[in-house]
Amino acid sequence: MFDIGVNLTSSQFEKDREQVVIRAKQAGVSGILITGTNAQESQQAMLLAQAYPDYCWSTAGVHPHDASQWNDAVAEQIHHMASADCVVAIGECGLDFNRNFSTPEEQERAFSAQLAIAAERSMPVFLHCRDAHSRFISFLTPWLNRLPAAVVHCFTGNRHELDECLAAGLMVGITGWVCDERRGLELRALLPHIPADRLLVETDAPYLLPRDLRPKPASRRNEPCYLPHIIRQIAEWRGEDATWLGQTTDENARRVFRLA
């Protein structure tokens, strides 16, 4: 089983990052993709991935929250990092109109620029979309035939949005959000509609600790070692065997990020 979304650069992991990776391995997690969300964190993610060869890989990009930072120097840094063997996708990039920490115009400019970098380098994109679906799809669609793959990370949309993502050929990342009995029920109902070969799984650690973990962890911090729990729950709600689903999503991740 492969965790396609871990924010291992987070300060929440500062004191025990090595132990977090060890616990993930002990739990049966076979690989981790470390998320880059701005130029500095993408650099940190790349260095962490290089510290754990053949177990950790990373993305390089600028999250929509940080899109106001986008300029030619940042673009050059992302280009440079993308040439490293351990950097396997451009992102986390996309649109987030929920809180607009960067203006929609700044987000769209950074998103378009990163799609262009991914197309130029023939790399997959690791995507973020929140409260911006129609604009997100309209921006992304013209680039899709020039990209080897596109992953919509931490999908929390509705049935119409899922159908549009699938029709566009996107891979769909599901997190422990689906384990939330308050907010995750709509997403849970959508799980059977995602073809097995388009499904990816992720913790988004240290965020989105599954609310149904028992016994409840002392800390609210999420970790990649909880990925098996998320997979077991997803498998149950899809009516599939958890071991098979873990293996299938692992194969999907290695195919999409060209790790096989």
Curated annotation (Swiss-Prot):
| Transmembrane parts of this sequence | none
Pfam families in the cross-refs? TatD_DNase
Query: Can you tell me which residues bind a divalent metal cation?
Result: E92, H128, H153
Q: What is its EC number?
A: 3.1.11.-, 3.1.13.-
In alphabetical order, the GO MF annotations are: 3'-5'-RNA exonuclease activity; magnesium ion binding; single-stranded DNA 3'-5' DNA exonuclease activity
Major location (coarse): cytoplasm
Cofactor(s) for this UniProt protein: Mg(2+)
Q: Which PROSITE patterns match?
A: TATD_3
Location(s), subcellular: Cytoplasm
Identify the keywords attached in UniProt to this record, alphabetized.
Answer: Cytoplasm, Exonuclease, Hydrolase, Magnesium, Metal-binding, Nuclease
Q: Which GO terms describe its cellular component?
A: cytoplasm
Q: What is the role of the protein in this entry? A: 3'-5' exonuclease that prefers single-stranded DNA and RNA. May play a role in the H(2)O(2)-induced DNA damage repair.
Q: Subunit comment for this entry?
A: Monomer.
Give the family per the record. Answer: Belongs to the metallo-dependent hydrolases superfamily. TatD-type hydrolase family. TatD subfamily.
From the Swiss-Prot or TrEMBL record, give the protein name. 3'-5' ssDNA/RNA exonuclease TatD
* Gene that encodes the chain: tatD
